[in-house]
Each structure stands twice: as structure tokens, then as C-alpha cells.
Swiss-Prot record:
Membrane topology summary: Multi-pass membrane protein
Catalytic activity field: a 1-acyl-sn-glycero-3-phosphocholine + an acyl-CoA = a 1,2-diacyl-sn-glycero-3-phosphocholine + CoA; a 1-acyl-sn-glycero-3-phosphoethanolamine + an acyl-CoA = a 1,2-diacyl-sn-glycero-3-phosphoethanolamine + CoA; a 1-O-(1Z-alkenyl)-sn-glycero-3-phosphocholine + (9Z)-octadecenoyl-CoA = 1-O-(1Z)-alkenyl-2-(9Z)-octadecenoyl-sn-glycero-3-phosphocholine + CoA; a 1-O-(1Z-alkenyl)-sn-glycero-3-phosphoethanolamine + (9Z)-octadecenoyl-CoA = 1-O-(1Z)-alkenyl-2-(9Z)-octadecenoyl-sn-glycero-3-phosphoethanolamine + CoA
Family to which this protein belongs: Belongs to the membrane-bound acyltransferase family.
Residues annotated as transmembrane: 22-42, 61-81, 88-108, 184-204, 236-256, 263-283, 365-385, 415-435, 443-463
Protein name: Membrane-bound glycerophospholipid O-acyltransferase 2
Organism: Mus musculus (Mouse)
MF GO annotations: 1-acylglycerophosphocholine O-acyltransferase activity; 1-acylglycerophosphoethanolamine O-acyltransferase activity; 1-acylglycerophosphoserine O-acyltransferase activity
Location in the cell: Endoplasmic reticulum membrane
Pfam families per the UniProt record, alphabetical: MBOAT
Function field: Acyltransferase which catalyzes the transfer of an acyl group from an acyl-CoA to a lysophospholipid leading to the production of a phospholipid and participates in the reacylation step of the phospholipid remodeling pathway also known as the Lands cycle. Catalyzes the acylation of lysophosphatidylcholine (1-acyl-sn-glycero-3-phosphocholine or LPC) and to a lesser extend lysophosphatidylethanolamine (1-acyl-sn-glycero-3-phosphoethanolamine or LPE). Does not acylates lysophosphatidic acid (LPA) and lysophosphatidylserine. Prefers oleoyl-CoA as the acyl donor.
Regulation: Partially inhibited by thimerosal.
Length: 519
């Protein structure tokens, strides 16, 4: 019998009983499918060429709030409270310090909600809790605060290229702000997007992106808006396959079996390593489903266009949250993290890593743990992740250049690093799935903390080279587009100082994880 536990509507309880899935998960999927249809309608009948930005903002906001109340009931008021108070802080605190005040309040409010949900209501229950959307709203609030701070307080020469490209030069109106944080396309599962990208989409400027010509220069083509139909269809196919895999295979390979006493006592090391990998592999399709569906919804509305490739084919991956092929074929810890929950990784980079004055890696992992929630397993995963990241970086910097030639040696190196990466990632994230301290330590004990020990030895024995903070190619493409939009809004390229002083950095989210599809 499917559970009837939900804070939202029980209208779909008969469907929940029929498919034997919890009502909160049914509500989430049905609302996302409704959002998909609404997105098609929004792009067709409320296109920026047919209606004003005001109407598009209002409709996107009202639909988003309706979906939120349907899924979460009165708990959805937290979305408005958190967003509303943060907006007031932006106005009152001023552009000099608003980013710090908004960061502390938004993250603190999220943490309080997570603590009450976990330790007062349903510890260990992966329901479609209201803190999931709040995680995305928190990303948007803090991103916008830093972006306004960068655009209205700091001098251009003080900004990095990424910060300069995403800087917001004027204070958003209340409607623009609420539309950005609570629109129907991203209210339930994200992903995070930058404020400038969202406003460009609403105002109809996002599709006017220059296409690279044969001589390498950008040319503005006078073609109609690119159609997202092919991209949406492809992503819906991925959603269907991911959901099918999750409903059929995932339950046959539970992560908890890694700490089964009989399995630990009888399984050989190759068997343990193999099952560890396949059980964590089977745990990923639920994320593939949720994030890819969220991406498809945004694309169906016309949001997510990132220009054309060299063949003139439209790309709809501006706010994509993952790259499945790169994840499954990752040959380094960094490669895996760069392609998993992409928008959240960008948020962490922009609000923490690039701004940290010391130990940026440690601070970033700590912020990630706080943002994800209060389960002890999260912190154990991210503490382990810091160790694994530093060790993997040291190994790569010291040895990779020896294996680049000939191609056969490079292939051998890639195979070995693929195996090492997949086992290390699986080993690291087991506590994230198990949640609690005791089962997590039971797992690590059964492995004799071997990867922890190896990582410590690597850091002690190998010289550690400091890595430079770089901007990715995708980010550079996005920033060049953002710069064009910014110049269009502010032709003189000057910082405008408003009486509503505020501050904001750059952030593109990511989505974040949606609890309804987490074990």
C-alpha cells in the first residue's frame, strides 16, 4: 500500500494506490508533467513577441506558487517567507553588505527548516519535503545578492571575468525577483540559473545569440527562434529510460546490502568492489530522471538556449544539470564532479570557492554539506570528498604527464583511472545514501578505511601543486553572451548606484537534488 503521508494535496491518492508509489512522489511527477505542458503553452501563447514581460512574470510566478502549494500545502509559505525577507534585507542592508546578510539569512533559514523536518518530523524519510525547493531558492537568493553586489558596488577591475559577466547593474523589482525565485519551470526541481539569463529569457533576448561563422567571427542570423522540440524529445526519452531503470533495476541493488553482515563475511574483495560500484550506479537514475525532466521543462518554455555549435545546430544546455555520458565515463574525481549537479557546482564555485580567502576546497565542501542538509552522512561524505579530491589532484599532477604518449599507454592510463574513479566515488558517497553515522562507519570499517588511508599517504608522500582557479569553456561561452546582454542594458558599461543598494555575485544553479526521488 502506497503511503498517504504528504503535506500537499491528496487528490491523486487513488493514482498513488494504483501505481504503488508514495503520494508525494506521485504529486511531484504529475506536477512536473503539468509544468511541461504549461511550458509548451507558455512558449506558444505567451511568447515574448506576443505579450509583455509583466504578463510573463505574473503567469510564471502564479503557476509556480500553485504547483508549490499543490505539492507541499501550507509549507510552501516558507518559499515566500524566505524570499520576501531576503528581498527586504537586500533593500535595507545596501549593496556593500547585502550579499553577506542574505547569505547568512537564506542559508540559516534553510538549515532551520531542514533541522525541524529531519529531527522533529520524519528522520530518514525521503519524502517530497519542502526543503528541496528551498535549497534551489537559497541558491538563487544568494547568487542574486552577490551578483548585485558585484554589479552595483564593486569596480569592474576588481571582478573576475565570470563575476563581470554575471554582474547585475540594477535592483530587480519585486515581481522580477519573485518570478526568478518561484517560477513554475524551476520551483520543484530547479535547476539554478543566473538572474541575467532568466530576465533575458522573459524579455525575449535569450534567443538572439550570435552564431559562429566559418571565419571564426560571430554573426547574427535573422532566423526565427530556435525550436527546442528536438532537445525536449531527447531529454524526455532519457527521463523515460531513467525512470524505467529506477523502478525495475534499482530496487534489486540496494546500497544497504553493502553493510549486510553475511555479505561482508562471505564476499571476496573483487565481489565487494563490484557490488559497491553497481549499487551506486543503480542509485543514480532517479537523479537523472528528476534533473533531466526539469531541464526539459525549461527548454519547452524556451529557456536554456546556449547558441549554436560549429555546424549551426542549436544547443539547449545552458542550464543542464548533468552530463550522463561524462559521469559514467569519468576518469578523474574532478571530471565526475564537474558533470554532476552542474549548476550547484557552479553556485559553490561562484559564491564560495572563488571568494574564499583560505582553504577554498575545504570551505566549498563544508558549504555543500550544510546546504544539502543535516544528516550526519552528508558531512561524512563531504569530509571524505575533501580528502579524495586533494589526493586525486596530487596523483594526477604528479603522474598523468608520464602517460600521455603513446596512445596505447594513454588508453591504459584512462582505463585504470576510470576504475579508480568509479570505486572512489562510490566509496565516498555511501554515507550520503545511508544517512546515519553507525551504518556509514560499519561500511568504512568493512573496507578497513583503505581509501582514507591511501589518500592520507598520498598527501604525505607526494608534492602537492597548487592548482589555478580557471573558468571552464562552457562558462566562458555563457559569459560572452551575458556581456552582450549587459551592454544592451547598460550601453556605457558603467556601474549604476541605486538608492536601493544591493549586492550580488554570479551563480547558475543547479539544480539541486529533489528529495522525492532520493532514497
Amino acid at each position: 500500500m502506497a503511503t498517504t503521508s504528504t503535506t500537499g494535496s491528496t487528490l491523486l491518492q487513488p493514482l498513488s494506490n494504483a501505481v504503488q508509489l508514495p503520494i508525494d512522489q506521485v504529486n511531484f511527477v504529475v506536477c512536473q508533467l503539468f509544468a511541461l505542458l504549461a511550458a509548451v503553452w507558455f512558449r506558444t501563447y505567451l511568447h515574448s513577441s506576443k505579450t509583455s514581460s509583466f504578463i510573463r512574470h505574473v503567469v510564471a510566478t502564479l503557476l509556480g506558487l500553485y504547483l508549490a502549494f499543490f505539492c507541499f500545502g501550507w509549507y510552501a509559505l516558507h518559499f515566500l517567507v524566505q524570499s520576501g525577507i531576503s528581498y527586504c534585507i537586500m533593500i535595507i542592508a545596501g549593496v556593500e553588505s547585502m550579499q553577506q546578510c542574505c547569505f547568512v539569512f537564506a542559508l540559516g533559514y534553510l538549515s532551520v527548516c531542514q533541522i525541524t523536518r529531519v529531527y522533529i518530523f520524519d528522520y530518514g524519510q525521503y519524502s517530497a519535503d519542502f526543503s528541496g525547493p528551498m535549497m534551489i531558492i537559497t541558491q538563487k537568493i544568494t547568487s542574486l545578492a552577490y551578483e548585485i553586489h558585484d554589479g552595483m558596488f564593486r569596480k569592474d577591475e576588481e571582478l573576475t571575468p565570470s563575476q563581470r559577466g554575471l554582474a547585475v547593474r540594477r535592483m530587480p523589482s519585486l515581481l522580477e525577483y519573485v518570478s526568478y525565485t518561484c517560477n513554475f519551470m524551476g520551483i520543484l526541481a530547479g535547476p539554478l540559473c543566473s538572474y541575467k539569463d532568466y530576465i533575458a529569457f522573459i524579455e525575449g533576448r535569450a534567443s538572439h545569440v550570435a552564431q559562429p561563422s566559418e571565419n571564426g567571427k560571430d554573426e547574427q542570423h535573422g532566423k526565427a527562434d530556435p525550436s527546442p522540440n528536438a532537445a525536449v524529445t531527447e531529454k524526455l526519452l532519457v527521463c523515460g529510460l531513467s525512470l524505467l531503470f529506477h523502478l525495475t533495476i534499482s530496487n534489486m541493488l540496494p546500497v544497504e546490502y553493502n553493510i549486510d553482515e553475511h555479505f561482508q563475511a562471505t564476499a571476496s574483495w573483487p565481489t565487494k568492489a563490484t557490488y559497491l560500484y553497481v549499487s551506486l550506479l543503480a542509485a543514480r537514475p532517479k537523479y537523472y530522471f528528476a534533473w533531466t525532466l526539469a531541464d526539459a521543462i525549461n527548454n519547452a518554455a524556451g529557456f536554456g538556449f546556449r547558441g549554436y555549435d560549429k555546424n549551426g545546430v542549436a544547443r539547449w544546455d545552458l542550464i543542464s544539470n548533468l552530463r550522463i555520458q561524462q559521469i559514467e565515463m569519468s576518469t578523474s574525481f574532478k571530471m565526475f564532479l564537474d558533470n554532476w549537479n552542474i549548476q550547484t557546482a557552479l553556485w559553490l564555485k561562484r559564491v564560495c570557492y572563488e571568494r574564499a580567502t583560505f582553504s577554498p576546497t575545504i570551505q566549498t565542501f563544508f558549504l555543500s554539506a550544510i546546504w544539502h542538509g543535516v544528516y550526519p552522512g552528508y558531512y561524512l561524505t563531504f569530509l571524505t570528498g575533501v580528502l579524495m579530491t586533494l589526493a586525486a589532484r596530487a596523483v594526477r599532477n604528479n603522474f598523468r604527464h608520464y602517460f600521455l604518449e603513446p596512445p596505447q599507454l594513454k588508453l591504459f592510463y584512462d582505463l585504470i583511472t576510470w576504475v579508480a574513479t568509479q570505486i572512489t566515488i562510490s566509496y565516498t558517497v555511501v554515507p550520503f545514501v545511508l544517512l546515519s553515522i553507525k551504518p556509514s562507519f560499519t561500511f568504512y570499517s568493512s573496507w578497513y578505511y583503505c581509501l582514507h588511508v591511501c589518500s592520507i599517504l598520498v598527501l604525505l608522500l607526494l608534492p602537492v601543486k597548487k592548482s589555478q582557479r580557471r573558468t571552464s569553456t562552457q562558462e566562458n561561452v555563457h559569459l560572452s553572451q551575458a556581456k552582450k546582454f549587459d551592454e544592451r542594458d547598460n550601453p556605457l558599461g558603467q556601474n549604476s548606484f541605486s538608492t536601493m543598494n544591493n549586492v550580488c555575485n554570479q551563480n547558475r544553479d543547479t539544480g539541486s537534488r529533489h528529495s522525492s526521488l532520493t532514497q
